[in-house]
């Protein structure tokens, strides 16, 4: 079997799918994207495709190493996202050829279900509370919320009080009927993170995500030493070498590699094993589409330390398409009591509606995150 063609499709709301075709008619799907940089990743996919055309798709490990090492310059969000989507598609092909789901090829299940959580957008307490109520009606009891709006490097007590007030009202509204993590989104400087984490402790969040940016990872153990709240990070780390530094430094309790950013299934399985050796749990980052989610689920079901799975159903970014709009076998992604079951169809287990993908890829919008500025007109972290 040989790879004959790679096609990419930029899609709403902010996704990109790729299709790898073979000379035997077996097709694999992947989801390579950096949100807001889809065209750049698309170019990288097709550059890497030069290494793949005519090659045997079953040699996943070798092809991964070729894509990673052969170009001399390596790593980073663009190249690792391109590799990630290609890697997903190669695993999809292998599973289809062998008539087995990817988790079966990786040694079989370590669990029968995995807890899912849902993003709730909005910064106003009333909007967040309404969003939680809506999602609870369809079975969710675990959520992730914005931990704050933009903060200055040293900000005032009013900004801190505003962030804490939102969380306080949510805990008051729902008590211990729900659990929620708080995403600082890298918006907070290390000095302000110390202040904000201390103020949020009484409301017992499940975790705090990206308390500071990954490039400030030396602060993770310092922040962890002052709080009992688990700290989480990983969406802006792109290989096991990025995660190695964080694991060695300590401070992070939950790793969040993104299966569409951090080298795909092949790399993230290694990252999961590294985390387990440090007694660190796994909660793959996934505010993306169905192929990315499917890839995450296969890792969840073979990784002992996986504890939570993010998914994008109803997420505030989904303008123009919802999580399962391009999926034929929607029922396989159904949740029971807030848990996903293993996908059982061969490969990744997601059947893509290709005709719909082609139609929606025509004139797909180029999503960009907003540009925020502080009161003094300097650029703020989004």
UniProtKB/Swiss-Prot annotation:
Residues that bind Mg(2+): 183, 209, 235
GO MF annotations, alphabetized: galactonate dehydratase activity; hydro-lyase activity; magnesium ion binding
Cofactor: Mg(2+)
CDD domains in UniProt: D-galactonate_dehydratase (cd03325)
Signal peptide: none
Record SMART domains: MR_MLE
Stored Pfam families: MR_MLE_C, MR_MLE_N
Sites annotated Increases basicity of active site His: 258
Cofactor annotation comment: Binds 1 Mg(2+) ion per subunit.
EC number(s) reported in the record: 4.2.1.6
Gene3D superfamilies linked: Enolase-like C-terminal domain, Enolase-like, N-terminal domain
Reported induction: Part of the dgoRKADT operon, which encodes proteins for the metabolism of D-galactonate. Negatively regulated by DgoR. Induced by galactonate, but not by glycerol, gluconate or galactose. Repressed by glucose.
Pathway: Carbohydrate acid metabolism; D-galactonate degradation; D-glyceraldehyde 3-phosphate and pyruvate from D-galactonate: step 1/3
Top-level class of the enzyme under EC nomenclature: lyase
Residues the record marks as site: Transition state stabilizer: 310
Catalytic residue positions: 185 (proton donor), 285 (proton acceptor)
Highest taxon, organism lineage: Bacteria
Phenotype of gene-disrupted mutants: Deletion mutant cannot grow on D-galactonate.
Additional note from the record: Reaction proceeds via an anti dehydration.
Family in the record: Belongs to the mandelate racemase/muconate lactonizing enzyme family. GalD subfamily.
PANTHER family: D-GALACTONATE DEHYDRATASE (PTHR48080:SF2), D-GALACTONATE DEHYDRATASE-RELATED (PTHR48080)
The protein's name: D-galactonate dehydratase
Native source species: Escherichia coli (strain K12)
Gene coding for it: dgoD
């Amino acid at each position: 079997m040989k790879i004959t063609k790679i096609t990419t499709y930029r899609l709403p709301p902010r996704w990109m799918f790729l299709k790898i075709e073979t000379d035997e008619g077996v097709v694999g799907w992947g989801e390579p994207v950096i949100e807001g940089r889809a065209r750049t990743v698309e170019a990288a996919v097709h550059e890497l495709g030069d290494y793949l055309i005519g090659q045997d798709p079953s040699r996943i490990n070798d092809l991964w190493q070729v894509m990673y090492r052969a170009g001399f310059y390596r790593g980073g969000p663009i190249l690792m996202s391109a590799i990630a989507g290609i890697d997903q598609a190669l695993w999809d092909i292998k599973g289809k050829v062998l008539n087995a789901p990817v988790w079966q090829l990786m040694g079989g299940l370590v669990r029968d279900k995995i807890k899912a959580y849902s993003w709730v957008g909005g910064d106003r307490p009333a909007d967040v509370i309404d969003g939680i109520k809506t999602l609870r009606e369809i079975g969710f009891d675990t959520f992730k919320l914005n931990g704050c709006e933009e903060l200055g490097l040293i900000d005032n007590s009013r900004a801190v009080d505003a962030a804490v007030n939102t969380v306080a009202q949510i805990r008051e509204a729902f008590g211990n009927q729900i659990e929620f993590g708080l995403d600082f989104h890298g918006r907070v400087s290390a000095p302000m993170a110390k202040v904000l984490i201390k103020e949020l402790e009484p409301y017992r969040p499940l975790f705090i995500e990206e308390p500071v940016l990954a490039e400030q990872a030396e602060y993770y153990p310092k922040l962890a030493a002052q709080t009992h709240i688990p700290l989480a990070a990983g969406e802006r780390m792109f290989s096991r070498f990025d995660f190695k530094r964080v694991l060695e430094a300590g401070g992070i309790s939950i790793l969040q590699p993104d299966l569409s950013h951090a080298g795909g299934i092949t790399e993230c399985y290694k990252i999961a094993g590294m985390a387990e050796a440090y007694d660190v749990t796994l909660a793959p980052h996934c505010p993306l589409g169905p192929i990315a989610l499917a890839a995450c689920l296969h890792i969840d079901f073979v990784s002992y330390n996986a504890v939570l799975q993010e998914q994008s159903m109803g997420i505030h970014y989904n303008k123009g398409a919802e999580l399962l709009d391009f999926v034929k076998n929607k029922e396989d992604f159904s949740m029971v009591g807030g848990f996903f079951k293993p996908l059982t169809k061969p490969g990744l287990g997601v059947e893509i509606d290709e005709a719909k993908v082609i139609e929606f890829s025509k004139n797909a919008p180029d999503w960009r995150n907003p540009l925020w500025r502080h009161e003094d007109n300097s650029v703020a972290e989004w």
